Swiss-Prot record:
Residue ranges occupied by any FERM domain in the UniProt entry: 204-519
Superkingdom assignment: Eukaryota
Organism per entry: Mus musculus (Mouse)
Metal-binding is among the record's keywords: no
All residue ranges annotated as the WW domain in the record: 33-66
Name of the gene: Frmpd4
Biased composition (Low complexity): 900-913, 1223-1232
Protein name: FERM and PDZ domain-containing protein 4
Tissue-specific expression: Expressed in various regions of the brain, including cortex, hippocampus, cerebellum, olfactory bulb and medial habenular nucleus.
Subcellular location: Cell projection, Dendritic spine
Amino acid sequence: MDVFSFVKIPKLSSHRTKSSGWPPPSGTWGLNQVPPYGWEMMTNRDGRDYFINHMTQAIPFDDPRFDSCQIIPPAPRKVEMRRDPVLGFGFVAGSEKPVVVRSVTPGGPSEGKLIPGDQIVMINDEAVSAAPRERVIDLVRSCKESILLTVIQPYPSPKSAFISAAKKARLKSNPVKVRFSEEVIINGQVSETVKDNSLLFMPNVLKVYLENGQTKSFRFDCSTSIKDVILTLQEKLSIKGIEHFSLMLEQRIEGAGTKLLLLHEQETLTQVTQRPSSHKMRCLFRISFVPKDPIDLLRRDPVAFEYLYVQSCNDVVQERFGPELKYDIALRLAALQMYIATVTTKQTQKISLKYIEKEWGLETFLPSAVLQSMKEKNIKKALSHLVKANQNLVPPGKKLSALQAKVHYLKFLSDLRLYGGRVFKATLVQAEKRSEVTLLVGPRYGISHVINTKTNLVALLADFSHVNRIEMFTEEESLVRVELHVLDVKPITLLMESSDAMNLACLTAGYYRLLVDSRRSIFNMANKKNAGTQDTGSENKGKHNLLGPDWNCMPQMTTFIGEGEQEAQITYIDSKQKTVEMTDSTLCPKEHRHLYIDNSYSSDELNQPLTQPGDAPCEADYRSLAQRSLLTLSGPDTLKKAQESPRGAKVSFIFGDLALDDGMSPPTIGYERMLEENPEMLEKQRNLYISSANDMKNLDLTPDTDSIQFVANSVYANIGDVKNFEAPEGIEEPLLHDICYAENTDDAEDEDEVSCEEDLVVGEMNQPAILDLSGSSDDIIDLTTLPPPEGDDNEDDFLLRSLNMAIAAPPPGFRDSSDEEDTQSQATSFHEDKEQGSSLQNEEIPVSLIDAVPTSAEGKCEKGLDPAVVSTLEALEALSEEQQKSENSGVAILRAYSPESSSDSGNETNSSEMTEGSELAAAQKQSESLSRMFLATHEGYHPLAEEQTEFPTSKAPSVGLPPKSSHGLAARPATDLPPKVVPSKQILHSDHMEMEPETMETKSVTDYFSKLHMGSVAYSCTSKRKSKLPEGEGKSPLSGNIPGKKQQGTKIAEIEEDTKGKAGTVSSRDNPHLSTFNLERTAFRKDSQRWYVASDGGVVEKSGMEAPAMKVFPRGPGLGNREAEGKEDGTVEGGADDASVLGQGDRFLTDMACVASAKDLDNPEDTDSPSCDHATKLSEAEDNVARLCDYHLAKRMSSLQSEGHFSLQSSQGSSVDTGCGPGSSSSACATPVESPLCPSMGKHMIPDASGKGGRYISPEERAPGHPNHGATFEELHPQTEGMCPRMTVPALHTAINADPLFGTLRDGCHRLPKIKETTV
């Protein structure tokens, strides 16, 4: 016999549908045969019958079919007993409350009077039901002769004779639990009716699904409202910011995914559950009104913040953001979610993709469309790079906590236009004209009109603070007329579908309460009792006949049309409405019915001043309560600027036929496409998300995309045929002629790299409590016994004023990428905000700097320059202007020297780190970066890092050596936010390099580098850098086994002859991917700088120079090879002056330093550098000036004819192939090839076609003899044609282990471009 089996119950299942359920067919429900409705009888293994009450989830043994079985508790009994001298009172009491008689002693005074299990409620005349056990014992012992007990026998049970009272007490405290399944499976199949009916857990019990996978059930009656459920959930989940939450209905539409319907808090649960097709709906508890700043929500309510994160993860995986969520963003979010999941569960910072895939699977973190259309190996490759790049979100030396990662996750998502917003299709009614419009409603956009879906051009219709009330009227069949009353002007009238109208009204009202006034609702559901009585008549026939398939119920309707001949009683008039007569609803010519009429609006609130946080893009012009609307274009970066408030100006309306200014030329705004090598993959990506069945029918799939299953689940853009924002086929919609747009000349933003430089202090906060749900996940909460909710009128006016000032910013302005004035003005204003440590002579000129190495020295800078230095700079500036073409712009390659010195046993050594702007790319889109400033000191020019620069105060020592200082790389994010100082040891290695989403379809990282940087040109130099190597470290030539001295001796003459007199034009292709790629990979990044190169052969304007990263290593105390031979190493380098010349406007002169030897005069090879020898004979002031001038003269001739170029590896400081580690004992670092600090390594770059491309070998590979696993420079850097040969200063090559000319060799600093060279 089975453990559980059905007995005494006639089969009620339908064999045709293979389903069973309640209620049974009429005529077969006999009250005397089976249990009542909601009960089920079972039998246990002992054959005893018990019953399951599905309404209360109770399991009693009592038979509910008979009233006699409802046991009435026995009446209390009074028992008087006399103490026996031997047996006492003859019973044993337990320790429960109330005290229970455990056993009765046979032959004692209590035999026949007390029954085991009796509860002692009184002793003599004292109640002891709640008294402790010790008190009961004392009372019994105090009775010397007799005792009077008042006992009561609890409910009898069939098992009373078989179990003790103590065990019975334990069973009562821990009752038997039965897991109630959500679906009934018959013959291995789930019936459709049971599977789809998930809105009601059972009759009058609503099931609410939470985002964390749990469910809550609520019993309701006809008066239970949505607000009752929300307040109960607020109490159970310990939520403070309940204003962000709402209940929604998720409707599953065949062939069109799902659709979310907002529910008004005044609607009753009875109305919700009586909707047609309710068996295809689920009730969700969601954050529908997202905060503008997730950090603010974290401070106010950690539980709501955690809920928002879980909900956002579900929305990403379930593709609820539609096509707006690009592959790169989806992969970035997945990497963050993987990191959070691993840190939360394993308590480790090390992320393993294998562990993640085994434990959760990639489908837990990525949308199915990404998994289906991308190769698995490319997905894993991208995720591995992105997971490692997550550490770049925090300052170096700090660990990224799970809480910080969640904040960045939500910040990435907040850049999406549909995050917290919705798109609606509507018909604008203006007098007799009707035009189709697309509306965007969200916290940052207010109520905006999407003018062009291709260029994402939107215009602000109304801010939430301007909406007085919302009214809705039935129009024809499922159409509803929505009237938005804005200020005191004519209301905006829209015709919409009923479900969309309800979502628009609820979304607007919800954001109004969140951002403007939490005490007032601009969209109320009128009560039926306030409208008077009105008999149903024939005039109502057909007007509210809402069909099942197309019917989307208006939640605010108090009554609904029934089936058959039933009529609905439709009256929705608020008693506070002053202008509506009670008879209008029946005498209206078009038989319109007022569905929602708001209460009257007080004139005091209308006259409240509207705050304007931030700078208004356009000036408010009040003319008869009419203003100009802000015309703007949405972009990811402008969203950040407009995050504080959805409006930047007071907006009103001019209702006339005024067209949009034709002068607007929207730029191309969109996300960077991925999978470039596969054209058909672009078509896959474009058609990944389909919002209606018609789109699927019209989709022309390529053979490669036939197997892709498209998911139409874009619930935010829930309009079926609405065009996507980025849809290439987007068309310009009819303009709203009743609004006058003002032209705005803001620059366009096209940077989709999200800010990751937040220096969060939230890491020190306590971790938010995880959603703690009391009881089981399916416990039923009886809302019928809840007290009425209290009003929230006790809030003071200060909260209202503060909320009014915190209204979201206007739609982000449209910024023209060709506008340079805005960028310069921003740079100027940025400089004015800086704390000035010294007065600059050219303070008004915005100075662009590739890299800045702030020093740790504190204090104020020297006030002025040496007059000799000033005169020299002016002479060099004049020289630069003579060589500059008047009609062209040049590239200013500014090199910032960071002095660093160390003392070793009295031998003072000096080395200079130089960073060189060496990479040209078309990063015009990132024109928002701010310029750097130079501060003049006696050592030269030091770059002023934005907001974090410390000015060195050290003076030049007697030998002209700068003081030792520590350096760091300033990490420049991809936005205009202040950068952070990154310590020098934090250099991006190839293993930790982030991979852009565009590379997902490339075959390897090197192929992607090659593709990105094809044709990019950078200037390089072949000057040497002094370095030390530990004793005994083996060194070998870069290529072949030929010693460096031999190469030097045989090549000098050839090189000089081959390089003299050759000049050409250097050109490159602008690569749109270079900027965003470098922004994530370099330790220091400048968003976009305009560089101008001056050349005799031709001048080409380039923009978007990315700053190279530089790694600075302090000089080691150990002696190098030269010290071992007894020679002093005290090289003085002119680069220590850090000289930089400020040209006129944006033209700057390239700064370089000549390398001189001050002490190694015994080296005969030093005589080959006349300029450096001359510099050592001058005085201290003249020495610096002379060396600077001589070097510039030589460098000017060399740079005009330079040929070599290098790309990503050079600019990033050997982040790919040098292998410079933070703990490296050698001085290997990322110095550009033509830096004077970089040795030739036995090679010289010449434009001879007979040579072969060189390959770089890192010191880690040379020492143990392992082969180089990195790609060769020829593979990484294809060279464009027309490269200019270079006339160099005599390049003197030295042997690797011999005395170098200008300093010891430096490992890991030599990266060769792809050029031809001659070797011996």
